[in-house]
Amino acid sequence: MLVAAGQFAVTSVWEKNAEICASLMAQAAENDVSLFVLPEALLARDDHDADLSVKSAQLLEGEFLGRLRRESKRNMMTTILTIHVPSTPGRAWNMLVALQAGNIVARYAKLHLYDAFAIQESRRVDAGNEIAPLLEVEGMKVGLMTCYDLRFPELALAQALQGAEILVLPAAWVRGPLKEHHWSTLLAARALDTTCYMVAAGECGNKNIGQSRIIDPFGVTIAAASEMPALIMAEVTPERVRQVRAQLPVLNNRRFAPPQLL
């Protein structure tokens, strides 16, 4: 099946961001994409107000997702993205949602909040407390992760042991010394750790690197974007997963217990 990742620079106006997302969804659907991943925290972004995305939080029943759900009804594609959803007054969850045929079929509150590199996501965002069930798309099992989750191999491994063949990752990977190197290294490492495909969508713009990637179970990049707005696509197959796992049976060779969420 064909998978895709779309990237753009999120603006401070949620209506504009919704239209960009809907346009990318339409482009992906026109190419018969089955699984489409958008970046993280799509409601609003402002280089001078780090809290704008949380301040702009909307309910899952809100207008932003309403626009995307209407677009989703037009195709057979599964679309993955994250937005901030109100939790308690002044706070939010960083919530991944999966859309199919206009319906929200999965949700996942980000487990690992980005309290690193002088940024403290937990100041305004509440962490989730459970791993999302796997999705099924065109007969392939899909695991859900968000951005900073990439640095924690236990989440990817837990989902691979549950049967995941593809791991999706909406992200807004912040620029900084060696951060692009970390991104490419970690994506390849998670693919190799789990012998899963990785489909990662990274927001571009002044603060984030973009560089969306699709990586095969052997850690090979099969589609990649630069720092500019882009839509990338690649073919993925269960046969490739089986082939790699026959040659590199790391999931069967493990001598450690399966990861457990604290």
From Swiss-Prot:
SUPFAM superfamilies: Carbon-nitrogen hydrolase. Keywords: Hydrolase. InterPro entries: C-N_Hydrolase, C-N_Hydrolase_sf, De_GSH_amidase, UPF0012_CS. Residues 1-238 form the CN hydrolase domain. It comes from the Bacteria. It is an enzyme of class 3 (hydrolase). Gene3D superfamilies: Carbon-nitrogen hydrolase. It catalyses: N-(4-oxoglutaryl)-L-cysteinylglycine + H2O = L-cysteinylglycine + 2-oxoglutarate. One of its GO terms (molecular function) is deaminated glutathione amidase activity. Its EC number is 3.5.1.128. It holds the Pfam family CN_hydrolase. The active site is at residues 40, 110, 147. Belongs to the carbon-nitrogen hydrolase superfamily. NIT1/NIT2 family. NCBIfam families: de_GSH_amidase. Hydrolyzes deaminated glutathione (dGSH) to 2-oxoglutarate and L-cysteinylglycine, and no activity on glutathione or L-glutamine. May function as a metabolite repair enzyme. This is Deaminated glutathione amidase. It comes from Escherichia coli O157:H7.
